[in-house]
Amino acid sequence: LRSGHLQTWITGLYRPVAQLPTPRIHRIPIGEYGAMLIHENVPESLASDAPSVLLLHGLGSSHAGTYMTNIASGLLARGCRVFRADLPGAGPSSQTTHLPPHGACFDLVRICLNTLSHTQGIRSWRAAGISLGGNVLLKMLARHAIDPTKYPFDFEVDYALSVAPPIDMKECCENVERGIKRLYTHYFIRILKMQARQQASIWPQWREVLRNADYRTIRRFDETITAPLAGFPSADAYYQFGSSIDDLKNIDVPTTILIDEHDPIVPAHIFDRAVFSATTRLVRTQHGGHVGYLHRLPISDGKAGGRWQRWADNTIAAELAKPNWSQRSG
């Protein structure tokens, strides 16, 4: 598939979820906001030096999403200990915090990692973030590097991988309001509207903001729902605080950012404005769309011939599971 739109659309329809063992659920307190949920799976035989990997999902997804489960499956097969986060308000975390799913929750993710590092005896982490989760990961790494006193890490990060991160959140919201890309706005708004109604059935804070809810665009949704619930005075303030584009030059751990030149949601040109640190590698692909990367296996591949394969899921798992990342980052 050579069209970024086709890659993105088909990925939205082709959702094979990997079957994983029942996870252990960690309920992590996040102060006055309640708790976040982290879902842990371990391989059948866990080595003492097995890498611990955190996975962060994108907007409208959760720990149970297609790429989250498929990447986790690949990591487990490679002997890794896997932790899939539900960002605040996403998936089952909607039951434990009134916060909305949002792209400025990097400090809450840091708190979760600190807690897990202490309770589980984990000294070092590898992490991957997909789409909005990728921006959250980059922002967390950068803010720690800028101000380790305010944003302390009680752990080391051996390696980070960010896929299709909306590093300029305002620009990405404006981008999906142009032309045919409005279809993506309709897709996200449909999911967000459904989530909002579910949240309002649980939390009075949601019932209050929904009185003035505006669902016409993602920006209007963020202005009337996300920003006030997340503690920001406006969508612009939320985007400014959450976007990682101005902080990327400060990241001091080995980091790969994977983007596609034909991503219809996160435009590649925003990365031309970014300044990257010496430890960051930007990888540009062609025709992958927004976290798509689908291709058909040749008919000659036996029973699998002609089937779609999700290239990125396996590639991300293989990259995160590489040996000796700790030595490379030291």
Model-derived regions: residue spans:
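Active-site nucleophile elbow and catalytic-triad environment of alpha/beta-hydrolase enzymes
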Residues: 224-247, 253
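N-terminal cap/lid segment of alpha/beta-hydrolase-fold proteins
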Residues: 4-45, 302
